UniProtKB/Swiss-Prot annotation:
One GO cellular component, as annotated: plasma membrane
Protein family according to the UniProt entry: Belongs to the p22phox family.
One record GO biological process: sorocarp development
A Pfam family matched in the record: Cytochrom_B558a
UniProt-listed PANTHER family: CYTOCHROME B-245 LIGHT CHAIN
Organism placement in taxonomy: Eukaryota, Amoebozoa, Evosea, Eumycetozoa, Dictyostelia
Mutant phenotype after disruption: Prevents formation of fruiting bodies.
InterPro entries membership: Cyt_b558_asu
Subcellular location: Cell membrane
Subunit structure comment from the entry: Composed of a heavy chain and a light chain.
Superkingdom of source: Eukaryota
Protein name, per record: Superoxide-generating NADPH oxidase light chain subunit
Sequence intervals crossing the membrane: 9-29, 36-56, 62-82, 83-103
GO function term, MF aspect, one: heme binding
Length: 118
């Protein structure tokens, strides 16, 4: 049986959070704080290609293969989304992804980008 990495699981949770961010941002356009909705759409659109396993992004994806940095980014970017009702679910999913990234970093896992260079 192959070795299972929690970092890959955290990336999949993060991709689900990106879809929730985009959907919540579209719904949030009709709320009072439109800037949070626009922020969530932009964050979801930028994070999705970085979390998706695309080979041609190469060194750009290296930031998400350092799991401590990925956990801090996911937790930090989710803070503003707690202030608008449609984006709260996405913020919670991003925080779950940050916790899983942190657990995988504590366990000593390394991303695929760094495994290939050894």
């Amino acid at each position: 049986m192959g070795k299972f990495k929690l970092g890959n699981w955290a990336a999949m949770i993060g991709m689900a959070a990106c879809w929730c961010l985009i959907a919540g941002g579209i719904m949030g356009i009709w709320y009072e704080r439109r800037y949070i909705a626009i922020y969530s759409i932009c964050v979801g659109g930028v994070l999705y290609p970085l979390l998706y396993p695309l080979s041609f992004l190469g060194p750009l994806k290296a930031i998400f293969h350092q799991y401590y940095v990925a956990a801090a980014l996911m937790a930090g970017l989710s803070v503003l989304c707690y202030f608008l009702v449609p984006t709260m679910l996405a913020a919670m999913v991003m925080d779950i992804s940050a916790v899983v990234f942190l657990i995988s970093a504590i366990k000593g896992e390394r991303g695929d980008f760094f495994d290939k260079q050894d």
